[in-house]
């Protein structure tokens, strides 16, 4: 332990035992409190005295009482130590202190202090570095592009890795990236990519066609079991035609393959090493349980990122810290433009049709549909940043608000099932908002005699299918990436999607057939019709119950430039920059 941590333990012992700022205690008792030898206790007390934290008056003789006088009351002392931890960038110790049994008023001040630590910081001055520190209240799941499925992790992976092409959703076109050009044969079944020369991975290795082939083969590997493996099904062969030329041979013509090679799942990884090594604008320099550190890639094949360093820190779930890109607040800072974002995709409930249970009964699913009155839930839980959803697309939810729902309708549908009081298991992520939704639904279900058992599980178990295999239904969310059509298809094809996992039997086959037609369709209007048909079918069959979209509004200071948020709610780290104050 560090000296600061010993001092904190001493102050916590003082608080727990209601000692005054002058505390009488033996060296042996102190050794027990701080879990060290009597000799080390004396060394620690001398060092704390030198730091002017306390005065130590040792007792005469072995076993006699010593007197400790703290120079500050416990609130002031804890806050001072907390500031020192942050000044020394010992965020681990600061976060551990937040987890201690402190009074609410002290914790409130610590959270406020921590808030100022995140956001943009400039290190220097001689070697000025732009550093962005971002808090997250949960552990990160995988950043491996072949497996990444969570929106924030997908965004971080985009900063580490690159794809052959990039898709421009607004212009509906594919732009060159790692491949500077590509050809599609007359029959549409052979696609040739021409790779840029001189592109380097973060480990210094030059990218070649062998790395692209390896990336594809790894995604296709049955043993690897990537949730995006379905994207490889239409490819019959891959051939390296030279170090910077590669060909993909398709089983049939489909433009969707260009979408696949633009997706994060096919981001290129080096043939000989896959541990977070990419070609992206940022490289991983540190990755522990509590922090991910990204440094600007100075050898990036395109324009270097303006930010020099990004740190993503895990903080306690109850932390009142919500900054992502904002600068520390300043009284003199002019307000910049607000960026509005309404989540594309939505939270939803779906049912496990792999399990032999009452969820196969339409009337039961309708009972849950009637119970899950989102407009009422938003009102009762005061969740004003939510929009009740009737579609995965917010513009459609606005045009078609939810129909009126009543407990009487829910009770009538439940009665039609012949329900006998059995317990139904509802799974959801062990997160604040998911818990609130699940508890609200459980309470409402009780009013019509429906027994629901809540099963929260951590995000780290997202890919473990056994964790939710015996669930009857799940409360989940889907946030779409900028490539909307691909994101929609992924919702049904991606193995980590609970709609893909749970939608089984004839219902699943029917939906997958229409998804297949959507994949082969190139006309934009016809694509919309297929997506409308799928959503309508899911609604009528009560297979996916849309709940709400999340509305986000971010206000950025005027000095934060080039901010444009993607559908995940993140700004592209490689583009944002801080305009320095000029005196």
What are these regions (language model features)?
Residues 67, 228-271, 286:
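Surface-exposed binding/hinge segments that line
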């Amino acid at each position: 332990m560090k000296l600061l941590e010993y001092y904190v333990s001493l102050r916590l012992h003082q608080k727990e035992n209601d000692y005054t700022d002058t505390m009488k205690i033996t060296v042996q008792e102190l050794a027990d409190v701080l879990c060290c030898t009597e000799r080390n206790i004396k060394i620690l007390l001398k060092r704390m005295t030198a730091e002017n934290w306390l005065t130590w008056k040792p007792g005469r003789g072995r076993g006699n009482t010593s007197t400790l006088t703290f120079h500050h009351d416990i609130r002031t002392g804890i806050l001072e130590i907390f500031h020192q931890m942050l000044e020394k960038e010992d965020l681990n110790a600061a976060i551990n202190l937040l987890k201690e049994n402190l009074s609410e008023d002290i914790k409130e001040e610590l959270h406020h202090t921590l808030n100022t630590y995140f956001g943009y910081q400039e290190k220097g001055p001689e070697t000025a570095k732009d550093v962005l520190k971002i808090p997250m209240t949960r552990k990160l799941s995988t950043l491996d592009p072949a497996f990444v499925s969570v929106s924030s992790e997908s965004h971080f992976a985009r900063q580490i890795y690159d794809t052959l092409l990039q898709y421009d959703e607004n212009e509906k076109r594919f732009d060159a990236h790692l491949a500077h050009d590509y050809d599609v044969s007359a029959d549409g079944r052979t696609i040739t990519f021409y790779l840029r020369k001189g592109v380097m991975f973060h480990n210094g290795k030059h990218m070649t066609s062998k790395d692209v082939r390896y990336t594809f083969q790894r995604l296709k590997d049955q043993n690897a079991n990537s949730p995006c493996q379905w994207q490889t099904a239409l490819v019959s062969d891959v051939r390296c035609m030279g170090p910077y030329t590669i060909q993909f041979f398709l089983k049939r013509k489909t433009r969707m393959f260009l979408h696949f090679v633009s997706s994060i799942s096919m981001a290129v990884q080096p043939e000989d090493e896959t541990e977070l090594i990419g070609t992206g604008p940022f490289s991983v320099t540190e990755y522990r349980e509590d922090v991910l550190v990204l440094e600007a890639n100075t050898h990036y094949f395109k324009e270097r990122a303006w930010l020099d360093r990004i740190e993503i820190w895990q903080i306690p779930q109850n932390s009142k810290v919500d900054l992502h890109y904002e600068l520390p607040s300043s009284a003199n800072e002019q307000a910049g433009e607000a960026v509005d974002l309404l989540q594309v995709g939505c939270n939803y409930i779906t049912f496990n049709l792999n399990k032999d249970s009452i969820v196969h009964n339409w009337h039961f699913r309708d009972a849950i549909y009637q119970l899950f009155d989102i407009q009422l839930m938003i009102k009762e839980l005061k969740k004003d940043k939510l929009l009740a959803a009737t579609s995965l697309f917010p513009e459609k939810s606005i045009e078609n608000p939810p129909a009126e729902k009543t407990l009487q309708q829910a009770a009538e549908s439940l009665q039609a099932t012949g329900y006998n009081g059995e317990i139904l298991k509802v799974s959801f992520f062990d997160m604040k908002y998911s818990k609130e939704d699940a508890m609200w639904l459980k309470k409402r279900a009780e009013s019509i005699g429906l027994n629901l058992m809540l099963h929260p599980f951590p995000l780290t178990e997202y890919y473990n299918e056994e964790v939710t295999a015996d669930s009857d239904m799940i409360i989940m969310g889907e946030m779409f990436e900028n490539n909307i059509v691909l994101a929609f298809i992924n919702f049904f094809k991606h193995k980590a999607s609970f709609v893909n996992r749970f939608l089984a039997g004839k219902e699943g086959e029917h939906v997958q057939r229409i998804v297949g037609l959507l994949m082969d369709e190139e006309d934009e209007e016809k694509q919309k019709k297929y997506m409308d048909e799928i959503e309508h079918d899911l609604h009528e069959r009560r297979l996916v119950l849309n709940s709400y979209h999340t509305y986000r509004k971010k206000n950025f200071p005027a000095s934060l430039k080039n901010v444009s948020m993607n559908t995940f709610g993140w700004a592209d780290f490689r583009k944002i920059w801080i305009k320095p104050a000029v005196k």
